[in-house]
From Swiss-Prot:
Similarity comment text for this entry: Belongs to the universal ribosomal protein uS4 family.
Subunit structure: Part of the 30S ribosomal subunit. Contacts protein S5. The interaction surface between S4 and S5 is involved in control of translational fidelity.
A single MF term (Gene Ontology): structural constituent of ribosome
Name of the molecule in the record: Small ribosomal subunit protein uS4c
Localisation per UniProt entry: Plastid, Chloroplast
CDD domains: S4 (cd00165)
Pfam annotation, one family: Ribosomal_S4
GO cellular component: chloroplast; small ribosomal subunit
Amino acid sequence: MSRYRGPRLKKIRRLGALPGLTRKTPKSGSNLKKKFHSGKKEQYRIRLQEKQKLRFHYGLTERQLLRYVHIAGKAKRSTGQVLLQLLEMRLDNILFRLGMASTIPGARQLVNHRHILVNGRIVDIPSFRCKPRDIITTKDNQRSKRLIQNSIASSDPGKLPKHLTIDTLQYKGLVKKILDRKWVGLKINELLVVEY
């Protein structure tokens, strides 16, 4: 399957708040929710919804998610925790978490249009895996800085996770360490995704 480009509000109505996909949040207690979610939920449906949450939040294709699950399965630690760490260390997600982009699709666009440097080199692959001590900056031109400046001004500095730091004056972010489970920006049961 390809990347989802359709109506975002339909997805957040069905799956709940997905901060990486859109800033909007679903209305609580809507009639649509009662219509769709009547009756007992089956185990398959619960697992599928958790997987879809992960896919739509991080903007992954089905094949990319399967590849990440396969890599996480080879690790000696908890598969679910390794999966979340792999997804959180993607360049597009780190830009979103730093506040340099309002959504993950917006961060993907910044990376694809070559506005972002990692350790002084242009990176145009959104799935680039960042490592601790990586420095993420923008190009020196005014257009790149203006795009980042608008996003940083509208972001909440209190939501910055502990594994990242940002210098808002120089438009520079630093990955300090690999993230802990409690700082993941999405409420999800990753074990259900692995079981699916």
